[in-house]
């Protein structure tokens, strides 16, 4: 089904969005420069499950905003017109087999030049494999596994927003250095959780702490009470949860109901999005320290963009939404620079490129492993009486510079083919 660009949820969920002609028209692309004389951007993510709020339809909104900003910036000089840019979307249901099938459909049947987003690490690795086989692009924003820039790296895959090393390097190290020496870790038993457990164990140990136990849970999962009881039984300083999205919300609620905070057991959250805080309430997360890739109200530039996003989506953006905007915009900038959708040419343009946009601060696209490094932030959830408006949930404690935030390239294990 094809629809004109629209801001409604129905349009976002329709599967295909064709961006209609802009007022001033614009030049046609160079003869033969673009496959089927158009650019097709796929957004593949969770639109119905535990990650739909942090990603989902609003990631499509962010990509649409990037398209419109590209067209507005270049006007008649844009190498592709609005009529030639198509945004397609699908729900991978957080299942790697579904993600694999949807990626094949996007690349082969729908002509996708690039697939964006793809939360859930197992799903992301499936899509990355398809991208590598088909020599098509995948910019991953939603998943955390370092395998995307490690042993399973590919010339056609870029990891845009965050990863488990970044999260552990910020939160694991800081909490341990501030007195949380004895940890129990609860993690979802799939690629993301396994990678998080490994990264946090390494970070805690390097900071002088110990992980006395790790507990794997099903994914997705509603009831964490048994796992929390087991983790708390040894009297650790910290329970580190590696859940995300709806699973994180369930775990935090049950942690508070069990009174574990009152027992002196802190909760460290490996991965948190602002949508998680909004769903459960700032009082449930008060004082939680975590590492954030971006925050909507961290400066004037981010707030201005977030105000636009609020008008389009009805909510403030998560860092995944901002990351999807950035990835789509930088892809279109590469198309503009090269005047083609040829994947190898786009990769050559992006490799080693320094990037500044609303999401990427001090950004650089590493040619060696395609890890996109950028400044990240140590954040703390505000107390309820500090909140001045809806979505005003975080204090930024400090900035972690790009070169310190991410795994050194010589440790990545990537052998780029």
Predicted regions and their residues:
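Short, low-complexity disordered leader/linker segments with a strong preference
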Residues: 1-40, 413-417
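Beta-alpha junction/loop-to-helix N-cap segments that form part of ligand/metal-binding clefts
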Residues: 26-32, 55-59, 73-151, 160, ...
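Extracytoplasmic "Venus flytrap"
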Residues: 31-35, 39-64, 90-96, 119-120, ...
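Short, polar/charged alpha-helical segment
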Residues: 54-78, 198-206
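Extracellular/periplasmic Venus flytrap/periplasmic-binding protein
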Residues: 98-101, 146-147, 154-257, 294-304
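Periplasmic-binding protein-like
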Residues: 106-119, 139-141, 184-187, 235-245, ...
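Extracellular/periplasmic periplasmic-binding protein-like sensory domains
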Residues: 255-327, 336-339, 392-417
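Segments of small-molecule ligand-sensing domains
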Residues: 311-321, 332-396
